[in-house]
Amino acid sequence: MERGEQMPKVNKHKKKKSTYYPDMCFGLCILLIVSFFFHGINVIVNFSVSVISAILFDYVGCKIIKHKFRVKNCHAVFIGGLISLMLPASAPLWLPVLGCAFAVFLVKTPFGSLNHAPFSSVSAGVAFLSICRPDLVFDYASAEFGTVSIARSLSQGTPVVTAVDLINAFIGTVPGGAGMTCAVAMIGLLFFVLLRHPKSFINSLFFLLTCFVGAIVLTAAETDKFFALNSMRIILVRMCSGYTLCMAVFFVTEEPLSPKKKGRRIFYSVMMGVVYIILGLVSEFEDAGCFAVLLTNAFWPVAEKYIFAPVRSKKEVTSVESAESLT
């Protein structure tokens, strides 16, 4: 560079490209490998068909609203992959395709882009399927792992949980969604979130803490001998059952929907955990995790307006008064 020639300006405020959805798709691939080990080739077929259909639906939706189609952000892959893994391995091919169509055309497309949609597309798709065909969405019966999932057995009373049952819940040899049963894999993905997205891990941590407190309270209310070994096992099994760990990894951390500030992240995560616990008590569905996500998405703007906005205004008034007193 010659003397007198100015250095090119560097835009320090250039927006960093988000790696959230590509990273989450990597996590889905890990779950796909685990579910293939347990359920066979049918899981890969369902996963592939679901992902391809989500990409095609997203492309059509972008054409309809004349929006630029971006497959590289991996959001469509995330929608298709997660919906398929939340369904049973025996689900018919059309079921995840229908869920993807609802998620893309009725949740994502009307709002123009993933950054403007007020609801989780995946949660909306699975919730829609749960309402329309609960017999297929929660049909977890299999010759290898039995007919009753952990969530169903816990809802029917206080079961006797043996050490073998606890081990099965950790390694994933229990009835459930194709990619939702292996607690070891989910815990590994939580550490992955911690490494790649430490701010999002705050969401996961406080959501799980809320669910853990809820599991303790429910177990204490249902059992006479709370400090018995069976009670401790029930608490651990509750944490591994249903969509609990899936929500901690994929839903409560979803960047476009999560608040940015730490305090609001904590409040948002605790809110989702509380709603999830309440719905687990009153809902007729085997797992109401997706409805908990949607309700939290719906009520979060209300919390922003009536809880955080007044606090912010009060702080601004206080700072102005302090500045005036100094002058």
Residue map of PLM features:
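N-terminal signal-anchor module of multipass membrane proteins
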Residues: E2-C62, E316, E324-T327
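C-terminal ends of transmembrane helices
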Residues: P8-N11, L56-K68, V104-N115, M186-H197, ...
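Hydrophobic, membrane-inserted alpha-helices
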Residues: G27-V34, A54-D58, A76-L85, C100-V107, ...
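Structural signature of hydrophobic alpha-helical transmembrane segments
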Residues: G40-I52, S90-G99, A169, T173-A183, ...
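Cytoplasmic-side transmembrane-helix entry/capping segments in multi-pass membrane proteins
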Residues: F69-I79, P96-G99, H116-V126, F201-T210, ...
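A generic, well-ordered mixed alpha/beta core segment in the N-terminal half of proteins
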Residues: I79-E144
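Long hydrophobic alpha-helical segments that form multi-pass transmembrane helix bundles
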Residues: N115-G188
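Loop-to-transmembrane alpha-helix initiation sites
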Residues: P118-V122, I235-T244, R265, S283-T296
